[in-house]
Amino acid sequence: MEINAKPIDSVNVEVSAKVKSDEIKASVEKLAKKAAKTMKVDGFRQGHVPVAIVLKRYEKELTSDAEQDILRDVLNEAIKKSGKKSDELIGEPLISKFDRKDDGIDVELTASFKPSVSVEGYEALIPEFSTPRVLKKDIDEKKNELLKMFAPLEKVEGKRALKAGDFAKFDFEGFVDGEAFEGGKAENYLLEIGSGQFIPGFEDGMIGLKTGDSKDIEVTFPAEYGAAHLAGKPAVFKVKINEIQERKIPETLDENTLKAIMPNEEKPSEELLEERIKDQIRQDKIFKLISDELKPKFAEAVVEKFKFDTPKNIVEQEIDMQFRNAWNGFSEDERKKFRDDKDAVAKKRDEYRDDAEKSVRLTFIIDELARVRGVKVSDQEVVQAVYFEAYRSGRDPKAHLEMYRNQGMLPAIKMSMIEEKLFNEMFSKEDKKSSKKEKAE
C-alpha cells in the first residue's frame, strides 16, 4: 500500500493512496475466514463452513467490508505520517476519489483535525451594555394581563356591540357548497373574540354584532386545513349571538385571587406579585437584548479577531446545511436547474462558503470560551430539555429523545444549550461598567 500525506494547512491533510489488488484480495479472504468460524450454512456444521463457500455466497458484502477496512487503514497510516494524533481527528474524511481498477484502488481523501483555538483577550470584546430598565407602566400592563386571565366572566347587559377581547356565547352552523358539513354546528358555544381559535375571518366577522343579532359570515378554509374535504374551500357560517360576556378586572386584589396567581407562595401579596412581575420582565428584556444585540455583536467581533484554519469537512457540512435550508426559497426554475446542472450547484454552494467558514469558526470559539469559563451542560440536562420540549408539544418524551438520537442531533442540542448558558453568564444582569441598582420608574 502506497500512501502519501500532504498538509494543506494546520488542520487539513490531503491523502492519496494506491491499494494493490492482492492487498484487497487478502483482506477479503481474512474476513471470509473470520466469518466462516461463526456462520451457519445448511449442509455444514457451524464453524466448519469452507471459506470458498463463504466467498462464493457473500463476495460482494465481504468486498465492501474489506474496502471499508482498507479506508480505515489508509486513514490511520496517513495520520501517523502527518504527525497528527488520532484523537484530534474530527468528523468523517472527505473522499474525493475512490477508483476501482484491475490492479487495485486509487484513493484520494482529505482528513481534518480539531484546530487549536486561543481566545486570549476576549473580555475586551464583550460589548458595553446597561441592564434594561423595568418601568412602572410595564409592571402595571403585565399585572393587568394577569388579572384579566383570572378575572371572572360577567354578562354584558344591554345592546353593546361585540369587540375584541369579549366572549361571545352563540349558535352557528357551517355550509360548504350549500350543504351543512359534519362538525360545523354548535349551540351556545363560548368563544373569545380575537383568540384565533376559529379559521381566519370568522372572529373578525363577528365584531360589531349585538346580543340577538344574526349574520352569515363568509370565510375560506385554509389550504392546509386538517380536514382534506374542507381544505381551501369557501364556506358560509350562519351565526346568532345569544350573549356577550367580558372579564371584569377587580379594583383590589383579594386573597383568593392572589393565591390563584401565585399558588406556590406561602404569603402571596400584591407587593410580591409586582416584584415577581418585575423580575420576569427584566429577564425577558435581558434575553431579548442578548439575542438581538449583544450576541451578534460579540460573535462578529470574536470571529474577526481570532483567526485559525477550519476543518474542511465541517465547513462543507455547514455549506450543505445552508444550501438545504435555502432550498424552499428557490423558484421551481432554480430547483430544476440545480437538479440538472452540477456546475450550477457548485457555484451556488460557493456563495455560502464565507458564512459557513465564519459559522464553523464561531462554533470552535464558543467551545473554547465554554472550556475557559467552565461552562458545562450534562447529558442529563440535554435529556431533560428534550423531554420538556416533548411535553410542550404533546409528544411521547422517550420517542422524541430516540428520534433526536437516531438523527444524530443530540450533540448539536447540547452545543446549543452550552452556547445559551455561556452567553447568559457572560452578559450578566449587572452593567459591564457599573453595578448600579436597578429601579422601576
UniProtKB/Swiss-Prot annotation:
Consists of 3 domains; the N-terminus binds the ribosome, the middle domain has PPIase activity, while the C-terminus has intrinsic chaperone activity on its own. Keywords: Cell cycle, Cell division, Chaperone, Cytoplasm, Isomerase, Rotamase. It is found in: Cytoplasm. Involved in protein export. Acts as a chaperone by maintaining the newly synthesized protein in an open conformation. Functions as a peptidyl-prolyl cis-trans isomerase. Belongs to the FKBP-type PPIase family. Tig subfamily. GO terms for biological process: 'de novo' cotranslational protein folding; cell division; chaperone-mediated protein folding; protein transport; protein unfolding. Residues 165-250 form the PPIase FKBP-type domain. Gene3D superfamilies: 3.10.50.40, Trigger factor ribosome-binding domain, Trigger factor, C-terminal domain. Its main location: cytoplasm. InterPro entries: PPIase_dom_sf, PPIase_FKBP_dom, Trig_fac, Trigger_fac_C, Trigger_fac_C_sf, Trigger_fac_ribosome-bd_bac, Trigger_fac_ribosome-bd_sf, Trigger_fact/SurA_dom_sf. It is an enzyme of class 5 (isomerase). Its EC number is 5.2.1.8. It holds the Pfam family FKBP_C. This is Trigger factor. GO terms for molecular function: peptidyl-prolyl cis-trans isomerase activity; protein folding chaperone; ribosome binding. One of its GO terms (cellular component) is cytoplasm. The gene is tig. It comes from Campylobacter curvus (strain 525.92). The keyword Cell cycle applies. PANTHER family: TRIGGER FACTOR CHAPERONE AND PEPTIDYL-PROLYL CIS/TRANS ISOMERASE, TRIGGER FACTOR-LIKE PROTEIN TIG, CHLOROPLASTIC.
